[in-house]
């Protein structure tokens, strides 16, 4: 941990508890700040409040009182999920109070080697693969943190100058991280996500580009080269560009040619040996390979990781095989692109479980993939009618169900030996579940109840 004094004696407001907010509040106390912690909700667990107050932190819950804007805070550390049009946040913006996220705080105290990953899809898998690959050859600590469910600042506290930290960073986190400066930045892809938060696609892209904003030619931007738009986005970086390409559009970084993965012209391994399924995971592997090779990792270490790593929970996760049916949990697929890619990973007939929060879009784009890959669909949630329309256009039998739990026995009734039963909703979970993780866990529980087996 790097010693800094910029918070000594400063008044700091932490907005939003959560894992990152609580850790940030305690860290700020260590850094000498006078900390107030505020959450709009009232925590069900009183231990959270007790722990904060025991550290000398003033706690305000149940509201984001606008009066806090008049208390002379020097800095606001905001939960990434709180939008900037929140009245209290907007008041701080208007008066020019610096607003950062916990990721910025983590960067400020970190003095090791930083690798950061962002993108619309594939962030967590790429982050995990990169950390595992670098750790295989490392003589010092290699950890991961960030949007992967582990506080950036908490891990940064425990690492030294020779250690490496691989961070997954969302657009929400990056928007409040103005000085972050990874030596290696990775952009897996950029689609049109979270426009309810960012308002426009350009705002979303600009938030993502904060990952490379402070890089120089001595740093590296690893970026997907398979779309012209992404190549143009790369030109906005001052870093040395290192492309990765599944579609063989560049030989300057990592790429695939005739089923073989190459790094700058040298063979690494065949794509068929990657344990993770699907073209999206080839792309994730290519991104991780590029970062690993830039970090001095050997091909043997890369092969070891890619031939053994079976995936991240809720991300095209293999659950089990039962009576010759394969069950997969892809609850993290909360947009059309993710489900489109997931379907392309299977060469067996798919019984698709899809639906969720209605964000106002329709699903015509999925029709060709339904025609090619989907045998039947079970639809649920707010957008089930729109999902049903797309299934009907594809000529696929569609059954309506209440949710991802009740859909499991319905899918079983329609399945035959050799089929895949896949939860890949193409929508957020918030109409029925508090998170995609809970939705995925409940799906797995339903599969376990149906089969009488535990997930593998």
From Swiss-Prot:
Task: Give the highest taxon in the source lineage.
Answer: Bacteria
The pathway that the record names for this protein is:
Cell wall biogenesis; peptidoglycan biosynthesis
> What's one GO-annotated cellular component?
cytoplasm
Sorted UniProt keywords: ATP-binding, Cell cycle, Cell division, Cell shape, Cell wall biogenesis/degradation, Cytoplasm, Ligase, Nucleotide-binding, Peptidoglycan synthesis
Q: Any idea of its EC number?
A: 6.3.2.9
Q: What class of enzyme is it?
A: ligase
**Biological processes annotated in GO:** cell division; cell wall organization; peptidoglycan biosynthetic process; regulation of cell shape
Question: Which reaction(s) are listed as its catalytic activity?
Answer: UDP-N-acetyl-alpha-D-muramoyl-L-alanine + D-glutamate + ATP = UDP-N-acetyl-alpha-D-muramoyl-L-alanyl-D-glutamate + ADP + phosphate + H(+)
Report whether Cell cycle shows up as a keyword of the record: yes
Compartments where found: Cytoplasm
One annotated GO molecular function is: ATP binding
Record-listed ATP binding positions: 119-125
Q: What does this protein do?
A: Cell wall formation. Catalyzes the addition of glutamate to the nucleotide precursor UDP-N-acetylmuramoyl-L-alanine (UMA).
Q: Name the family.
A: Belongs to the MurCDEF family.
What is the designated name of this protein?
A: UDP-N-acetylmuramoylalanine--D-glutamate ligase
* Native organism: Limosilactobacillus reuteri (strain DSM 20016)
Which gene carries the instructions for this protein?
Answer: murD
């Amino acid at each position: 941990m790097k010693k800094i004094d910029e918070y000594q004696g400063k008044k700091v407001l932490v907005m939003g508890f959560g894992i990152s907010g609580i850790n940030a509040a305690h860290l700020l106390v260590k850094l000498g700040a006078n900390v107030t912690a505020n959450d709009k909700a009232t925590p069900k667990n009183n231990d959270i409040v007790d722990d904060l107050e025991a550290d000398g932190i003033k706690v305000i819950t149940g509201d984001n009182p606008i009066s806090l804007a008049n208390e002379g805070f020097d800095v606001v550390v905001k939960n990434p999920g709180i939008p900037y049009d929140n009245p209290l946040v907007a008041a701080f913006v208007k008066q020019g109070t610096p607003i950062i996220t916990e990721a910025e705080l983590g960067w400020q105290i970190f003095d090791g080697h930083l690798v950061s990953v962002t993108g619309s899809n594939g962030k967590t898998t790429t982050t995990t693969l990169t950390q595992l690959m670098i750790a295989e050859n490392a003589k010092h600590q290699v950890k991961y943190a960030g949007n992967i469910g582990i506080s950036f600042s908490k891990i940064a506290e425990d690492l030294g100058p020779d250690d490496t930290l691989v961070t997954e960073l969302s657009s929400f986190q990056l928007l409040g991280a103005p000085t972050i400066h990874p030596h290696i930045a990775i952009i897996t892809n950029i689609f049109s996500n979270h426009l309810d938060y960012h308002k426009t696609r350009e705002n979303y892209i600009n938030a993502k580009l904060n990952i490379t904003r402070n890089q120089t030619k001595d740093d590296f931007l690893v970026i997907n080269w398979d779309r012209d738009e992404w190549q143009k986005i790369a030109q906005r970086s001052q870093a040395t560009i290192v492309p990765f390409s599944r579609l063989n559009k560049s030989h300057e970084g990592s790429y695939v040619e005739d089923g073989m993965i190459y790094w700058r012209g040298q063979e690494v391994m065949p794509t068929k040996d990657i344990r993770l399924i699907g073209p999206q995971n080839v792309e994730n592997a290519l991104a991780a390979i590029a970062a690993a090779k830039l970090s001095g990792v050997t091909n043997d270490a890369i092969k070891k990781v890619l031939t053994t790593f079976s995936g991240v929970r809720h991300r095209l996760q293999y659950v089990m095989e039962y009576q010759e049916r394969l069950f997969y949990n892809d609850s993290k697929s909360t947009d059309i692109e993710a489900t489109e890619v997931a379907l392309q990973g299977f060469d067996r007939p798919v019984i698709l479980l899809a639906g969720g929060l209605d964000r106002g879009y329709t699903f015509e784009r999925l029709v060709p993939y339904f025609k090619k890959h989907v045998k039947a669909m079970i639809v649920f949630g707010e957008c089930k009618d729109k999902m049903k329309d797309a299934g009907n256009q594809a000529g696929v039998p569609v059954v309506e169900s209440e949710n991802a739990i009740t859909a499991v026995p319905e899918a079983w009734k329609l399945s035959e030996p050799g089929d895949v039963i896949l939860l890949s909703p193409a929508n957020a979970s918030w109409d029925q579940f508090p998170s995609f993780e809970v939705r995925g866990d409940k799906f797995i529980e339903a599969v376990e109840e149906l089969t009488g087996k535990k997930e593998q």
